Amino acid sequence: MKIYSAYLTLFSFVIIISCKRDNSYDLDNYLNRFESFVENTENNYNSDVRSQKLDSFNDFIERKKDFKLSSENIRTINSLEKRFENILENTPSKENPYSINFYFENSASMNGYLEGTEFLKVMYRVVGNIQNYDNKSFFVNSNEHQQSNILEKINKKQIKVGDISNSDHQFIFSNAINSASENNSLSIVVTDGIYSVTDGNIDIVPIKIEQAFQKSLKSKNTETVVLKLTSKFKGTYYSETCQPGKKAIKINQSRPYYMLLFGDSSVIDKALKDIVNVTELPGYNEQARFLSSLQSKPIYTILSQGEEKIGHFKPAKRGSSFFTEIIDVEKSKASRYSKGENKENVFQFGVAVDFSNTDLPNSYLEDLGNYSISQEMGYEILDIQNIDDVEKNSRTYKELNKIQEANKVEFTHIITVSAQTNLFGELEISLNKNLPEWIKESGTTNDCEIKGEEKTTFAFDQLIQGISKAYQKKSNNSNYLTINLKIKI
């Protein structure tokens, strides 16, 4: 019996040792296989095998529960997980394929830009970036002409394809937006923005473009981004308004050109980050974005403290740091913290807003002309300040930090409103769907005196106005959002 017990004890000990060795072997094998899997994925990853790779990754994550891991093992596994997550973030998914159509307007009026260093740098940057995606490239005028090695042809000034005497922007834009809508893809158009008015009537330009866009926007929420850039132009400019025989004008100067992007919100956001990043584009000037409606409504709160505040009020709900209704409102005389020259007999406060999900450029959000406020009350908007510009030692900055930490939010802007009369009621602040001021300033009705003119483009404002109206009509709404506040005695 004792001999049997001894054998049993020895047998159990051997099993334990064996299990420990097997476990150690399995763990080493697991870590080696996991690392090989991640390396292989980094080197050979494409969207077609995404789901298969993701399933394998999940298996590895599930398996780690089988082992007793040291702190070093945990760090190794966390590092491998992070590497794989980075691959997912930077690779288009099978479920949401990301393809790109690149359209280069090749009318004769584009030839002058091919001498410009800034223009060529932008083309190299953008066309180079789209090579990381499924893509097709086209020269476009009144038809599209698919091209291989389009960058090489642009660089060698070999862009004469099709009818280069005329550009049909209705066709170009409709074609681009339809391509983006059909496959949840991105369309990029490069153009000089000059609208060819064959019948001489510039007033019908916005109507034609609006109608073309309305058809394309009917069933999709495609967005449009317009970028204005500048480059050297050396060559012949073809005027739309000069008399026959005087339309071809030799110039050597800077001229604006434009890049338009079409796609849904997520596609546009990614494109502006990875493909057409404006910080990497020499000659970039301005940006506008057109959309039917916001993906989400912004959050906002009245600031109970800060340099913006003149007068007295309390939150309607006691103990709240996040509120849109105030009571016990009183005007105040001058304050050493007050903004503006006339600080007597004034009531004023700031509203912190999170515009981060609106998709609209800062230049649009910070333009006072794009806002309206309840006319029946006596308030006006004094200022729209970016949070990044708030002084770090100010009372406003401290108040913002307190609210953000307590409510797990991050604001982007402060809207300051002020009134001397009609203080009480329901105050509405609306962000309207306006044509950005820079677009209005970029258009001209006379391009005959083109020498020395480096900022305007014939009928460009009319062209973009048509796009803007199409988006307004799709949503049947003249504003993007409304901030609602209640102010009581």
Feature-to-residue mapping (PLM):
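C-terminal motif of bacterial Sec signal peptides marking the signal peptidase cleavage site
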Residues: I15-S18
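Bacterial signal peptide processing site
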Residues: K20-D22
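Short beta-strand-loop
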Residues: R33, N40-I61, N135-K160
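…and closely analogous acidic/polar surface helices at protein-protein or active-site interfaces
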Residues: Y45-T91, P97-Y98, A108-N135, I202-K218
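DG-centered beta-turn motif at the end of beta-strands
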Residues: F104-S107, N184-D199
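Von Willebrand factor
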Residues: N143-L186, Y195-S196, E223, T230
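Eukaryote-biased recognition of electropositive, low-complexity segments
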Residues: K220-A352
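Extended non-globular C-terminal regions
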Residues: G311-I489
